[in-house]
């Protein structure tokens, strides 16, 4: 009993120290740290990659990229290189594979053109990628990690889950052109069933298939609430198999405290040439757009690495500092003011005695403008004298 009490007290102490440590970081940096710890806890290994790839690699897979432009330059040997606009492509191409699953996480930057300024900018991302045999359990694990990642950002979050076997597979049966498919997909993503019906009618899609598309586009709610509706609408083998997969996910996550944050929403769609199976997007209260995106991409993985399946997601960290500004009460625990170095040889050892105990310390000649410390000392004649708390 005494041993348990000691361990419990030590655990609480460590937790308090960690909270104080994270409080000194920006939202972006603290998330990097916490998410890395989460992924390691689940057995994922950190993957580090080169900043550059040959331009032709990204150019050949341009359809997969969400970025409008690729930032390129000539290498010293004359090769055309690119600052990476995407991380998934690089991991699939370069990761070492084995008979076991390759479970990786990363903290990297990509370089993409801004939609607003049309200038290139650095975007920081973290995320996970799994290469190997993807089964229903692994899909549930990755979705659980995605939900936990969102909770780390904000307890008020939603993870919207969809499946490529429904609307994309139905569109493939209709015998319509690619431009019409794109128009219908835009309507589905915007939940615009009025225009969807008009496009289908103009394109000669029968009323039965049109209504099925409209009903599928309207599927949105918690898994247990809408999965029976979706199962009733399944009209081919691919849809029925997808319903079984979604039922497994629902059963696996039902006891999770995050289960009520997962929504089934078929308006979430992605590139049909690369993605298959489960796809998902994550939202938090203060951010105006998705901060997490992922899915299963066997088509892309198989294109780059034969007989390889894959699933993963990325968390976009670049704008979170804007939406989640931390209000730090103090800039440091201790501020020490001293006049000159002469006769103050013991000052450095004194500062180290504080930092060794976990305190944050700043040493200055004068009070920095706008700086706040829990305790302010003046260092005089080899000793500290408390001045004031500011």
Residue spans of the language-model regions?
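TRNA-binding/sensing appendages of the translation machinery
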Residues: 1-84, 140
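Positively charged, Gly/Ser-enriched RNA/tRNA-binding surfaces
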Residues: 25-42, 54, 86-97, 105-154, ...
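A structural signal for short, well-ordered beta-strand segments and their strand-loop junctions
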Residues: 46-49, 104-106, 158-162, 263-265
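Beta-rich nucleic-acid/ligand-interaction surfaces
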Residues: 49-67, 162-172, 268-277, 368-374
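Acidic, His- and aromatic-enriched active-site or binding-groove loops in soluble protein domains
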Residues: 69-75, 176-197, 284
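Short, basic, helix/turn surface patches
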Residues: 72-83, 186-187, 382-390
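Cap/lid and interdomain-hinge subdomains that line or gate substrate/regulatory clefts
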Residues: 134, 138-139, 153, 160-161, ...
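Internal, well-ordered alpha-helical segments in soluble enzyme and binding-protein domains
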Residues: 142, 163-166, 180, 184, ...
């Amino acid at each position: 009993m005494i041993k348990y009490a000691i361990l419990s007290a030590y655990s609480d102490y460590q937790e308090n120290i960690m909270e104080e440590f994270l409080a000194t970081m920006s939202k972006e940096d603290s998330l990097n740290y916490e998410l890395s710890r989460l992924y390691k806890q689940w057995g994922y290994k950190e993957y580090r990659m080169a900043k550059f790839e040959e331009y032709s690699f990204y150019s050949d897979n341009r359809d997969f990229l969400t970025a409008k432009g690729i930032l390129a330059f000539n290498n010293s040997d004359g090769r055309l290189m690119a600052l990476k606009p995407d991380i998934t492509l690089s991991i699939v191409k370069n990761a070492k594979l084995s008979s076991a699953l390759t479970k990786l996480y990363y903290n990297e930057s990509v370089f993409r053109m801004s939609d607003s300024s049309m200038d290139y900018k650095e975007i920081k991302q973290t995320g996970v990628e799994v290469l190997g045999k993807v089964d229903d359990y692994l899909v549930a694990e990755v979705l659980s990690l995605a939900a936990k990642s969102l909770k780390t950002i904000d307890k008020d979050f939603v993870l919207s889950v969809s499946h490529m076997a429904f609307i994309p597979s139905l569109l493939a049966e209709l015998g319509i052109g690619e431009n019409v498919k794109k128009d219908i997909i835009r309507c589905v993503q915007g939940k615009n069933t009025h225009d969807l019906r008009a496009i289908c009618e103009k394109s000669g899609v029968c009323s039965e298939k049109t209504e099925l598309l409209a009903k599928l586009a309207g599927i949105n709610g918690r898994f247990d609430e809408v999965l029976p509706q979706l199962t009733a609408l399944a009209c081919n083998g691919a849809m029925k198999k997808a319903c079984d997969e979604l039922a497994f996910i629902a059963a696996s996550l039902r006891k999770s405290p995050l289960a009520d944050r997962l929504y089934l929403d078929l308006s979430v769609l992605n590139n049909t040439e690369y993605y298959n199976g489960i796809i998902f997007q994550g939202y938090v209260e203060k951010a105006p757009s998705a901060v997490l995106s992922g899915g299963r991409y066997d088509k892309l993985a198989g294109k780059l690495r034969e007989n390889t399946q894959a699933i993963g997601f990325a968390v976009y960290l670049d704008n979170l500092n804007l939406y989640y500004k931390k209000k730090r009460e103090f800039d440091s625990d201790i501020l020490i003011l001293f006049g000159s170095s002469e006769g103050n040889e013991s000052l450095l050892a004194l500062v180290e005695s504080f930092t060794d105990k976990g305190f944050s310390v700043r040493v200055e000649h004068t009070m920095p403008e706008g700086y706040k410390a829990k305790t302010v000392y003046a260092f005089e004649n080899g000793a500290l004298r408390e001045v004031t708390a500011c």
